[in-house]
Amino acid sequence: MNPERQETISPKNVPFQPVPTPNQQSLQSRMLESNQAVPDAFQKVAAWNHYNAVATPPIGVPQTARPPSNQSPHPNPPGYPYQSHQQQFHPLAIAFQQPFGLPQQVIYPPPPPGFTPHRVQVSPVGLLGPPGFFPQFAGSTTSQGNPSEVSVRTKSAEGTTGPIAPSITTKPTSTIQVAPPRDPVAPTTSSSGITKKPENGEFSLVKTISGHTKSVSVIKFSYCGKYLGTGSADKQIKVWNTVDMTYLQTLASHQLGINDFSWSSNSQFIASASDDTTVKIFDVISGACLRTMRGHTNYVFCCSFNPQSSLIASAGFDETVRVWDFKTGLCVKCIPAHSDPITSISYNHDGNTMATSSYDGCIRVWDAASGSCLKTLVDTDHAPVTFVCFSPNGKYLLSAQLDSSLKLWDPKKAKPLKYYNGHKNKKYCLFANMSVPLGKHIISGSEDGRILVWSIQTKQIVQILEGHTTPVLATDSHPTLNIIASGGLEPDNVIRIWRRN
Amino acid sequence: MVEILDRTYGAQFPEELECHLDLQNASANCCKFNRWGSIVAVGCTDGRVLIYDFMTRNIARTFSAHCLPVSCLSWSRDGRKLLTSSADNSIAMFDVLAGTLLHRIRFNSMVTFAMFHPRNDNKAIVLQVNKQPTVEQFSPRIQTVLANDTPGSSDESASCVSYDRKGKYIIAGTGKGKLLIYNAETLKCVAWCKQNTVQQIRQIIVPMKSRFIITNTQDRVIRTYELEDLLHQRGQMVEAKYKVLDMVNKAAWKNVCTDSDGLYVCGASTKAHSLYIWESNTGSLIKILHGNKGEALLDVQWHPTRPIILSIAQGTVSMWTQAHVENWSAFAPEFQELEENEKYIEKENEFDMEDEDADEDMTSKSQDAEDDIIDVVNVRPEDYLASSDEEDCNIMKPARNLESGPLWYIPVPLDIENADNDQRLPDDIRNLDNLLNPAWVASAKGYELSPKSK
């Protein structure tokens, strides 16, 4: 073979020397084409030729490489047999192109070593993992953007609107770190602004619970009122006994921080939403993780049991609502609900209707059975909506916006009925709730550390609870007793229990 | 749910076949929705009764009720009890939540119909083959026969029977086309009348919310009467207020059902898997739903609150639902879909640079909002009773934990066999390989999956 190649090369060299400029252009285009078009099988051949070509520079191969490329761009009738001839020596042509590229490879030695660790890292895992491993790896890669492993809910909204996790947002410098007061009865400020001791009919601090090592992101009483659940950025959900607020159980199976959780109607199970893109079901008494639902492609920001506790709805930063069957753990519905991350999801009292809120400023009401959209509620300010929930009778919707306002909506008329102001809410997704024992109140935390209580009917601030030194995201009221629970961000990390006299 | 919509989208009757219920190798014979449509009971030919959670379509309970086909099912008012009747000459009553058998009564003949009293789950009406209907009281055990003591027709036997909407009257249909109305307390005949036919009445249907009763007669005509009109009759012939029939094929009706408002009537054909849907007051045929050829229909049921029909043919339960029509107006407020072009008349100040009346509008709006009384706790009776003229609203208020009130759902147990062992890993492994699935990495590195220390 070698003598034949030499013979074919030498006679063509003479007639094509006078045209050097088109040679260079055609040579470059051919190299690009060959690089793009060569399949994997031929890449090995090219690599082999590459090594073979390295040994030939002393012979003066670069000079002879130019003539064969001259032949290809000429579609002459006598060129037709040349093309057939060239097809026979296709590997040879590739071989002769490699030496021309040799200087580039010599100039850039670092790139080839950069690829080797990637292969080494991937292939052993591929051998160990099942075929479906790669999508989960992609999910993990998404989580990689959050190296501090802080729950996304406990970060401010300024840095969390994008699909890629941002760096840690600097905490507000105005916050003064003050030790919590040792006096168990914290001073309270009434609507008149005068600091005074708690009177009859007002909430007062009765207990401070420590247990979480990072920000408390969610607090919820169970429907029977016996348990209090607290979720945190330390990847744990702790359950407390509400009779004496003693520790009961820790639910720890998530890989990243907790964003939300929901109690089942019989208070036996908890469904939790986390940054690790999974929804998990825990048995409250034993603390065991019974099921892990995978399917979301980004942070799961909120989840909710339906009143029958047969379905779990979850939503998050992938802008979809997924409905999971509690019995089997399968995803029975996937609704692309909003055009921005979804911040809250809530069922009404009979489980027929579902409400979602989003950073796009919309609140959408859905038919839970068919998954169709019934209505969209938008106010004129289009502020991002961070929370939405139905009233106990399913007739009204309470929403929280990032313009420091709470709104009570009539979903039938699609307009807000009442506005509640006085707190500060610019960055975080706060929880709000309606407290119905002994009067109808709306309770919400604030980013300045206070907890505000409004009267639903008059919209007046009934009481302001002070004691937290960091923003209060998580608040909840007991279903039957006059108890409020609240949790603070880092470095507070404590749960405060307030009771009305 | 319908009230949230500004206007109805799509038809209010089923239009297409959606799916079949998973019967798990059973052969269905009859089915029945509870009051809210959240649970459906399916009676099978082998005597079993399957209770479905209709939202998830999962089987929640299974009762081995009988050894022969189940002929009829009836729910109590609060949904906590289920009455089944069968060809094995017996009826059985079950506690649905506990899954236990409460009563079983044996008869001498096959039982073709059994129905709870609408207001009293201690009473039921039972119809056996070739016998007069009997009123059964379970505790204490009393049986009373409904005698046909009308003049000139003592030998006619009842072919169908039903309570009226509130359980005040019992309506019986005879084999010669007569209707007898009894007082449910005294069991005395208070009225009787004739239809304009002497053929057998096969079925009497009482819609949940209307004042009508509907008869399915063997002459293939479905007649609608007003109950108040029948109460004044003493043997006269009464003309039907509305009547529907198949003008083309003259199909006979195996079973008839209506929606809860009584606006639509659905007839199940005896010869083919075809469901005919009429508008009740106009008698116009609006839809024919065709199933598989060669299948004979056994039962048909309309959902209490949704345009859904369950039909049973060849042992399979088919579900017919509305065609999905996307409601684009729901995604954007102030967006309205037009059926045809409309001439737009702009408002007075619509395009003004400055709104001169803005202050007044805002003032009036805020005043309107102030006057509204916000009630966030009380649920209106029609929301959970599907009717607004009930007298025991407080007793029937649903509770979330099912300790009181009606059984509006069945708690779902977790399928523990499929639960995954998602155990906690050592801290060093988790911190080191956060990107990967911890279980595989731990297995590859030879670490043992240690259970949680606490």
From Swiss-Prot, chain A:
Ranges of the WD repeats in the UniProt entry: 211-241, 253-283, 295-325, 337-367, 381-410, 422-455, 467-499
Positions of the UniProt region annotated as Disordered: 1-35, 58-85, 155-197
Coiled-coil zones: none
Biased composition range(s): Polar residues: 22-35, 167-177
One GO location term (cellular component): neuronal cell body
Domain of life: Eukaryota
Gene3D superfamilies for the chain: YVTN repeat-like/Quinoprotein amine dehydrogenase
GO BP annotations, alphabetical order: brain morphogenesis; establishment of mitotic spindle orientation; germ cell development; microtubule organizing center organization; nuclear migration; retrograde axonal transport; vesicle transport along microtubule
Alphabetically ordered keywords of this record: Repeat, WD repeat
Disrupted gene: phenotype observed: RNAi-mediated knockdown does not result in detectable defects in histone H3 'Lys-4' di- or tri-methylation in embryos or adults germ cells at 20 or 25 degrees Celsius.
Gene Ontology molecular function, alphabetical: dynein complex binding; microtubule plus-end binding
Record-stated family: Belongs to the WD repeat WDR5/wds family.
Functional summary from the UniProt entry: Not required for methylation of histone H3 'Lys-4'.
Protein name stated in the entry: WD repeat-containing protein wdr-5.3
Curated annotation (Swiss-Prot), chain B:
GO biological process terms held by the UniProt record: egg-laying behavior; germ cell development; heterochromatin organization; programmed cell death; transdifferentiation
Compartment list: Nucleus
Pfam family, one: Beta-prop_VPS8
Gene Ontology terms: cellular component: MLL3/4 complex; nucleus; Set1C/COMPASS complex
InterPro entries from the UniProt entry: RBBP5/Swd1, WD40/YVTN_repeat-like_dom_sf, WD40_repeat_dom_sf, WD40_rpt
Quaternary organization: Component of the SET2 complex (also known as the SET1/COMPASS complex), which contains at least set-2, swd-2.1, cfp-1, rbbp-5, wdr-5.1, dpy-30 and ash-2.
Biological role stated in the UniProt entry: Required for di- and trimethylation at 'Lys-4' of histone H3. Regulates left/right asymmetry of ASE sensory neurons, via its role as a component of the SET2 complex.
Annotated protein name in UniProt: Retinoblastoma-binding protein homolog 5
Protein species of origin: Caenorhabditis elegans
Taxonomic lineage from the root: Eukaryota, Metazoa, Ecdysozoa, Nematoda, Chromadorea
